[in-house]
């Protein structure tokens, strides 16, 4: 399994890969993860939860990616020890890994986590075109491409030429059940008792559309003056200073937004979701934000932009409301609607878990990988 970042780096993509790798290892398979040595305090090689992790030096960072000059040599050595290769994209060297796998007589599964969509600046657009070209080559040499939903694949310019290779498998999402006593205490500690609370989470980057939420907040407050908002995530993203660009929108809302920072502890994250009355996903583009499933499993309905991929969770469960994308008024209307009649949108935990079952996802990948290895 190859990907740019792996544990302890934490994004939806790395969480997905970690759950899948460890799930396959628990089923008795030998799993090796090849990833960048992005943090030199980590060991170059280690076993973690049954998974062998091999980290490759990455002396150059290219926007969100890591350039790994010796990756080819590492993959060439390891590929013959394994029956099939999986690559999680976006990853600059996917095409190289695919070529080396084929040279060794192995097949490559490319797991696509979303088209690369960068801000409009010349450098970001250069990166998008460069990486896009490399990913086009990768898709062409992939034997199978897995994606989180067929909806996203059908609307992806990048995947459309390769739909005959695409298999849709829901991501393996896991999160503890919320601690209700801790939720009540945390609300009180933050001074949020009695307030309607809207949660949002993730990297504060342009594609997440948080600027539309900032524009929607005053519109919500006109109709629900006591409403509060809570953000779980890192606003200061190294490769994209979008939060700083949004300060004119954020400053008027500052008194209504509680900044919680990046929450790494999974129990605390579950408590965050449960603390919120509604969870908001205002993305411009998003393949399949796993935060949506986490929120639903913690009993919190969604208000989500009606875009390919992201809308699949609401469509599959009915636990939330879809609103027009890139439209702060539609977003505000949706938030007020769900906050005003929250119980109408809440579904039983068992229904959500039956739809998004991590064991079923790992089993589906196991069957797919075994078919490719045979």
Annotate the PLM regions.
Residues 192-208, 214-217, 230:
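Conserved donor-binding/catalytic core segment of Leloir-type glycosyltransferases
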Residues 90, 284:
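Aromatic "clamp/platform" in nucleotide-sugar-dependent glycosyltransferases that forms part
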Residues 243-263:
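Nucleotide-activated donor-binding/catalytic signature segment of Leloir-type glycosyltransferases, i.e.
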Residues 70, 107, 117-137, 154, ...:
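Nucleotide-sugar donor phosphate/pyrophosphate-binding loop at the beta->alpha transition
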Residues 79, 270-276:
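Short alpha-helical donor nucleotide-sugar binding micro-motif in glycosyltransferases
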Residues 301-304:
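Short hydrophobic beta-strand element within catalytic cores of glycosyltransferases
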Residues 132, 136-177:
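A short, active-site helix/loop in glycosyltransferases that binds the activated sugar's phosphate group
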Residues 316-317, 321-328, 336-342:
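Conserved acidic donor-binding segment of nucleotide-sugar-dependent glycosyltransferases
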């Amino acid at each position: 399994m190859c990907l740019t970042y792996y544990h302890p780096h934490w994004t939806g993509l790395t969480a997905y890969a970690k759950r899948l790798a460890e799930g396959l290892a628990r089923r008795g398979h030998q799993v090796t993860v090849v990833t960048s040595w992005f943090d030199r305090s980590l060991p170059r090689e280690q076993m973690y939860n049954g998974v062998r992790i091999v980290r490759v030096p990455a002396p150059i960072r290219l926007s969100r990616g890591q350039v790994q000059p010796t990756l080819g040599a590492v993959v060439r050595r390891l590929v013959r020890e394994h029956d099939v290769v999986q690559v999680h994209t976006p990853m600059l060297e996917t095409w190289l890994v695919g070529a080396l796998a084929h040279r060794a007589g192995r097949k490559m599964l490319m797991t696509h986590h979303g088209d690369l969509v960068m801000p409009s600046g010349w450098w970001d657009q250069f990166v998008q075109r460069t990486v896009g070209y490399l990913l086009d080559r990768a898709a062409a040499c992939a034997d199978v491409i897995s994606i989180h939903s067929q909806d996203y694949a059908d609307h992806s310019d990048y995947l459309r030429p390769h739909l005959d290779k695409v298999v849709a498998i829901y991501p393996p999402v896991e999160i503890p059940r919320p601690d209700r006593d801790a939720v009540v205490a945390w609300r009180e500690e933050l001074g949020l008792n009695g307030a309607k609370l809207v949660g949002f989470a993730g990297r504060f980057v342009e594609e997440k559309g948080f600027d539309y939420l900032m524009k929607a907040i005053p519109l919500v407050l006109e109709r629900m003056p006591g409403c509060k908002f809570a953000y779980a995530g890192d606003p200061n993203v190294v490769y994209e200073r979008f939060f700083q660009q949004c300060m004119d929108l954020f400053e008027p809302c500052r008194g209504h937004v509680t900044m919680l920072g990046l929450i790494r502890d999974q129990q605390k994250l579950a408590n965050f979701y449960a603390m919120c009355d509604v969870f908001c996903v205002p993305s411009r583009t998003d393949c399949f934000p796993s935060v949506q499933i986490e929120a639903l499993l913690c009993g919190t309905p969604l208000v989500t932009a009606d875009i390919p991929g992201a809308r699949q969770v609401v469509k599959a469960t009915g636990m939330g409301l879809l609103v027009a994308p890139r439209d702060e008024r539609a977003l505000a209307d949706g938030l007020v609607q769900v906050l005003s009649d929250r119980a109408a949108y809440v579904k039983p935990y068992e229904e959500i878990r039956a739809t998004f079952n991590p064991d079923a996802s790992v089993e589906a990948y196991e069957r797919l990988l075994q078919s490719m290895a045979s």
